[in-house]
Amino acid sequence: MTTSALRRQVKNIVHNYSEAEIKVREATSNDPWGPPSSLMSEIADLTFNTVAFAEVMGMVWRRLNDSGKNWRHVYKALTLLDYLLKTGSERVAHQCRENLYTIQTLKDFQYIDRDGKDQGVNVREKVKQVMALLKDEERLRQERTHALKTKERMALEGMGIGSGQLGYSRRSRGSPSSYTSASSSPRYASDLEQARPQTSGEEELQLQLALAMSREEAERPVPPASHRDEDLQLQLALSLSRQEHEKGVRSWKGDDSPVANGAEPAGQRRQRDREPEREERKEEEKLKTSQSSILDLADIFAPAPALPSTHCSADPWDIPGLRPNTEPSGSSWGPSADPWSPVPSGNALSRSQPWDLLPTLSSSEPWGRTPVLPSGPPIADPWAPSSPTRKLPSTGADPWGASMETSDTSALGGASPFDPFAKPLESTEPKESRDSAQALPTGKSPSTVELDPFGDSSPSCKQNGMKEPEALDLGVLGEALPQQPGKEARPCRTPESFLGPSASSLVNLDSLVKAPLAARTRNPFLTGLGVPSPTNPFGAGDQGRPTLNQMRTGSPALGLPPGGPVGAPVGSMTYSASLPLPLSSVPVGATLPASVSVFPQAGAFAPPPASLPQPLLPTSGPMGPLPPQAGTNPFL
């Protein structure tokens, strides 16, 4: 160990430098040889660490600021900086551009040694190279790419080197002789000389390739576990389960045969293993046959097969024994059972049918024509039309209905159905009663009133040539009720029978006064501007005004002449009795008796007057009408 190396180690311990700073100090030492490539490669790798990067760059800037006698510190620091720009982190170039002034000052570096040799020229040339690399970004990018490729190539070439190369990297801290310690052994001297890179670029490339390959090996995903072991375990578990099942079956059957004892032949064992498969196949066949039979029952559109039964059910899934034995005439869409037709008597059907299905004489299509039911007392059906013959009047309870006549024949045998949209028939009510019903001002009719929930109370008019029915008039149902055989019809009393012969001489006063019919509107919300309002709540002002004579004779005040109080101005208005009466309009002598003084004496009250003044209406003088500004106010 040289004296400079020993002194450097002591300084490292005294100043407590970190590992990165120690490496930079060793690479930029004052020794007469250049920095080794392996050491610079380690420093370049440290620049990718944030903490180590700050320590490395701090020591480099300190070395660049040394004095002239330590020109090797400056030169080696520039050499290390050039190497870091090409192979280190990109932050090195960024920080060098920030401290570009520090590098530019080294262009004028001067130092002449004792022999008179200018040693500063080496520093000035190195500064020019570094400055050119920093200013040209494209060149810096190319240099970095080329250095990376060289490092990878050298790493691939160095993969065949044995473990003897490891001694090349092992060294004692701060000892420059440690880099050649591996060559001291004559055993590995020849191999190391052949594998050792000739240039620093090759050495750096080998190191980078080695690091990349080790990193790739570490990041390689773990290969998936083989499924062979899992398959073997699954087969073993299945075999054990099968054996346990066989043992359970044998113990349940109590079989002591050689089969149960484990001496079963191989052929019987195969047959026994195939039995579950056969059972499964049989179950599948049974399921298919059951499904096919269900589909046959569900085929309701196919013609029914010939069966000995004479009845056929309307149910598509009926019992096959109830199908007809002969093919029905006509197409398959021929007469069929109506689901809404009356149910026949119970003895006509077989008791084997659980839902009392309707018997028909044709195929079982539920959407076909209605067949003729067998004779017999029909069962009450809430959906079937009524059978007794009666004539419904035109003024029934249904305001939208029409007169319909039903017959006692079969409800399904040709009777016309009830049509709610048919044209209503003419009313049989006498014309005189209809005219009198229209003449009634109250809107009440002796027999019928239009059923309109949104209409007014005016009497109904004829529509479509007949009177509209009244919903609550039950008198029209009297004709539909059957007559009892033991009772005679009670005669209906009429005005002629009640009043006698004098009824013909009476005059109907209601028919003489006819109220004007208001415009009928079917829409209660159609109240536009064109429709006049039926009543005006503010129409009090339209009444006739009283004449002057009526006002004079109708409201005398305290015995005054009809013309009003003496001295009252023409057109003045007298005050109401509910308000204080002004003294200027009524004389004192006219309002109070003469015996009553105006001011009562002390301790006594004036007796009330015999009569209070009557309320006076507004009067107008005989000289002319009211002024134009006095309008008619309906609230006065």
Swiss-Prot record:
Residues with the modification Phosphoserine, per the entry, are 184-185, 257
Q: Which SMART domains match?
A: ENTH (SM00273), UIM (SM00726)
Which parts of the sequence bind a 1,2-diacyl-sn-glycero-3-phospho-(1D-myo-inositol-4,5-bisphosphate)? 8, 11, 25, 30, 63, 73
Q: Does the keyword Cytoplasm apply?
A: yes
Q: Which part of the chain is the UIM domain?
A: 202-221, 229-248
Signal peptide range in chain numbering: none
Q: Which residues form the ENTH domain?
A: 12-144
Composition-biased stretches (Low complexity): 174-189
The record's region (5 X 3 AA repeats of [DE]-P-W) falls at: 315-400
Tell me the GO molecular function terms: EH domain binding; lipid binding
Identify the stretches annotated as sequence repeats.
315-317, 338-340, 365-367, 381-383, 398-400, 523-525, 536-538, 633-635
| Subcellular localization, as worded in the UniProt entry | Cytoplasm, Cell cortex; Cytoplasm, Perinuclear region; Cytoplasmic vesicle, Clathrin-coated vesicle
Which superkingdom does the taxonomy of this entry point to?
Eukaryota
Task: Please give the name of this protein.
Answer: Epsin-3
* Protein species of origin: Mus musculus
